[in-house]
Amino acid sequence: MVSPRKGKRIRMLKKNDIIQVAISDLSHEGAGVAKHDGFVFFVDNALPEEVIDMRVLKVNKNSGFGKVEAYHYLSPARNADVNLTYLRTGIADLGHLTYEDQLTFKKKQVQDSLYKIAGISDVTVESTIGMTEPLAYRNKAQVPVRRVNGQLETGFFRKHSHDLIPISDYYIQDKEIDRLINFTRDLLRRFDIKPYDETEQTGLLRNIVVRRGHYSGEMMLVLVTTRPKVFRVDQVIEKIVEAFPAVVSIIQNINDKNTNAIFGKDFKTLYGKDTITDSMLGNNYAISAQSFYQVNTVMAEKLYQTAIAFSDLSKDDIVIDAYSGIGTIGLSFAKTVKAVYGVEVIEAAVRDAQHNAALNGITNAYFVADTAEHAMATWAKDGIKPSVILVDPPRKGLTESFIQASVAMGPQKITYVSCNPATMARDIKRYQELGYKLAKVQPVDLFPQTHHVECVVLLIKE
């Protein structure tokens, strides 16, 4: 719909007004975009080409939010089979879009960010690498526990709230993880365990966290409680392990703070090991409750394989792995290069990376706890000259000081693994100003059914 002609009197929209609109696009977060009388509205569960009756939820200066009251025309790209609960909680905020169209949407997000932020339109963005089976892929679940209708429930919070929606089938989580969560929920109900109450700051059980090795099948169960004393723990452990022999680790975490953080500082192993083990690209990894480990093992392997292919490595190459975590990317590179130098600010992750290198008999990978900027300056003084710098930053992207420090080392290539197209495009623009040219762009779908997209890009020194 077009903006009104100059001078035309406009009735200002207010909350709960219902208007008919056409959806013209999707936002970068997967919401439908509708334009009406100069306003842009964002509408959940609405797709391009759809015509809807929209209830106004909120109006800002030039934009607003609405929700679907009725559909007049449905997009042929709509997946009609998805449970709306997954949209309401954000578990699968793109689940109403067919998977083929999800992949197209994610490619477009990368293209749009590169053009709008970095002014780049002359580099091909490849089609998004997708999953053959894009459901039940998550190897980790973090599930809040609350009282709903008088009983302990597990599920997810409604979007933009702390109202728990009970769920038994989490759609994108490994089905064995779902089974363990539901079994634990039912078991703790029988023991009359009190769920956490955020408002009153009472109750014992806050969260259930489960990890499962994609290849090993090993499972870890973490019970997050508000105090150290636990409930008939021997009986609970016995019943869980009897029903799930693959559970090799049961851990208690104590979080007594009024916070949205999942974990507190204190962990206690109640049963079995402190870690589970899984493999990725032929390397084995010890994974603790807190370890950062990609939640989609199959697609993480494709992501890392893409980064390795883009880097075009040889036995004479030296690679710097910034943001090295527990070593998963760097150790994947180590087999094909002279040496890998990894840096990570979290000391526990560095210890895990060192342990994982030893676990796999890898002797040419070195990990330090430091800021990347300081570590790179130290390595430069020691005469280390990387041919490739690999970066895998958090969503906020790279700092100016990091970019300057990486350029100062003079690598021929920078391989950038991104989880945020906008900050990636910003950083690419800066690298191009400093003498690097964007050569390759490959989106990878690590998070099917959601709006999130990972991307691997290659920058080459001009």
From Swiss-Prot:
Enzyme class: transferase
Keyword Glycosyltransferase: no
Biological-process GO terms, alphabetical: rRNA base methylation
Top-level taxon in the UniProt lineage: Bacteria
Catalytic residues (UniProt): 419 (nucleophile)
Residue ranges of every copy of the TRAM domain listed in the record: 12-70
EC number: 2.1.1.-
Pfam families in the cross-refs: TRAM (PF01938), tRNA_U5-meth_tr (PF05958)
One Gene Ontology molecular-function label: rRNA (uridine-C5-)-methyltransferase activity
Keyword entries, A-Z: Methyltransferase, S-adenosyl-L-methionine, Transferase
Residue numbers binding S-adenosyl-L-methionine: 294, 323, 344, 392
InterPro entries: MeTrfase_TrmA_AS, MeTrfase_TrmA_CS, NA-bd_OB-fold, SAM-dependent_MTases_sf, TRAM_dom, U5_MeTrfase_fam
Family from the record: Belongs to the class I-like SAM-binding methyltransferase superfamily. RNA M5U methyltransferase family.
Protein's recorded name: Uncharacterized RNA methyltransferase SpyM3_1024
Organism whose genome encodes this protein: Streptococcus pyogenes serotype M3 (strain ATCC BAA-595 / MGAS315)
